[in-house]
Amino acid sequence: MVNTMKTKLLCVLLLCGAVFSLPRQETYRQLARGSRAYGGCSELRCFNGGTCWQAASFSDFVCQCPKGYTGKQCEVDTHATCYKDQGVTYRGTWSTSESGAQCINWNSNLLTRRTYNGRRSDAITLGLGNHNYCRNPDNNSKPWCYVIKASKFILEFCSVPVCSKATCGLRKYKEPQLHSTGGLFTDITSHPWQAAIFAQNRRSSGERFLCGGILISSCWVLTAAHCFQERYPPQHLRVVLGRTYRVKPGKEEQTFEVEKCIIHEEFDDDTYNNDIALLQLKSGSPQCAQESDSVRAICLPEANLQLPDWTECELSGYGKHKSSSPFYSEQLKEGHVRLYPSSRCTSKFLFNKTVTNNMLCAGDTRSGEIYPNVHDACQGDSGGPLVCMNDNHMTLLGIISWGVGCGEKDIPGVYTKVTNYLGWIRDNMRP
C-alpha cells in the first residue's frame, strides 16, 4: 500500500479538475486505499514523450513530462536555444524581441481580439498558451511576439538565434552494384553513421563482432539494448566507424574504446520493449569522431515527426544474408523498406509476438517473381539504423530490434521507435 503526500496531492488535483505537468519522478501509479483510481489516458494528450494520467470517470488529466520539457502538455522545450528554417516548429523559451522588449503573454486578455492568442482552439498545435515565448504561428519569416510600444500592441520579431546549418544525415551516396540475399552490398560513404561494435571474447583471446550501432554525435553511439544481455563491461567493448568491410580495416576508419554503456533501465529481454542503449566513446578531448565522407552523425528526428505510411526508408548492417546463413556478411549491406501503418504493426501480423507503442514496423512490400530478393534485417544487424529522408537530411526513425525470420514475404521487421526516446537520449548524454 502506498500512502504518500505526493500521491494524495496528485489524486486531489485530478479530482479538482487541475491540468498541469509533473516531473517524472513525482508521479505514482498506486493510490491509497479508498482514493479514486487513475490510469493511462484514453487518447494522446502529452507531447515529447510525456506520460498522461487520467482519473477514472473524469476527463481531467496530468502530463508527466520528461526532463527538459514543461507546459500543460509538455509542449515547451526548455533546451531549445535556436530555431531552424523559419522557426515554425520552435518551442523554446526565448521571450525577448529584437528591440529588447519583453514579449506579452499569449493568454493575456489584451490579445483576445488578435488573430493569434493562447485561447485559440488550435493554440497548442501552434505553440501558443499561457506563456510569453516567441513563436511563429503564421508561417512568418522567423519567430515573433507581441510587445507594447508607445502604449500600442505591435508585432516584433524575436532575437532568438538561428541554428547553424546541420551536416548530420548528409552523405555521398553510391548506387549499389551488387545484389545479395536480403539486400544490396554497399559502401560506408552511403551510410557514414553506421558503427560496428566488437566485444572481447570471454574464454579466448581476440574479439568478435557483436552488433551494429548508429553515430548520433561525435562521442555517442546509439544501439539496441539486447546486444548487451551478457553484460559486457565497457572496457571490453570497441566501436569502429567508417568501415565498409566488417573485419577488414578501412583506410579512413576510426576506432574507439567505450567509456560508458547505458542500457535502458526498463528494457524487457522477453518482449524487447525499450530496446535501446547508448555507448559513450572514449577520447582525451571533447571531440571523438572526426567528420569525413566515411564518418558522419545521423540526424535525430523531431519529437513530433510523423512520416506518411509506406514511406520508403533504408536500413544497413553487417548481418547475415538469411536466417540459415552460418556467417555474418563480410561487406556492409543496405536494404530498402517501407514504413508500415500502425494498424499493420500488431501482434496479429507477427505471429502473436508482443508489439508495443515503443516499436514500429518496416518491410519490403515488393513480391513475386520479379522481386524474389526481399530486403530485411537479419541476425547481426541488430542495433543498426532505420533511416528516412526528411527535410533533405537522412533522419533516424528506428533501431533494428527484432523480427520473425529474415526476408519473409509480408512480414515486416520491428524497430525501436526513436521518437519515443529523445528525452532519454538527451538526459543520458548530459555530462
UniProtKB/Swiss-Prot annotation:
Output a single Gene Ontology CC term carried by this record. extracellular space
**Any S-S bridges, and between which cysteines?**
C41-C52, C46-C63, C65-C74, C82-C163, C103-C145, C134-C158, C168-C299, C211-C227, C219-C288, C313-C388, C345-C361, C378-C406
Q: Quote the CDD domains the UniProt record gives.
A: EGF_CA, KR, Tryp_SPc
Which residues, if any, are the signal sequence?
Answer: 1-36
Query: Which keywords belong to this entry?
Result: Disulfide bond, EGF-like domain, Glycoprotein, Hydrolase, Kringle, Plasminogen activation, Protease, Secreted, Serine protease, Signal
Where does the record place the Peptidase S1 domain?
A: 180-430
InterPro entries to which the protein is assigned, alphabetical:
EGF-like_dom, Kringle, Kringle-like, Kringle_CS, Kringle_sf, Peptidase_S1_PA, Peptidase_S1_PA_chymotrypsin, Peptidase_S1A
- Per UniProt, residues of the EGF-like domain are 37-75
The Gene Ontology terms for molecular function here are:
serine-type endopeptidase activity
Q: What is its EC number?
A: 3.4.21.68
Q: What does this protein do?
A: Probably essential to support the feeding habits of this exclusively haematophagous animal. Probable potent thrombolytic agent.
Name under which the protein is recorded = Salivary plasminogen activator beta
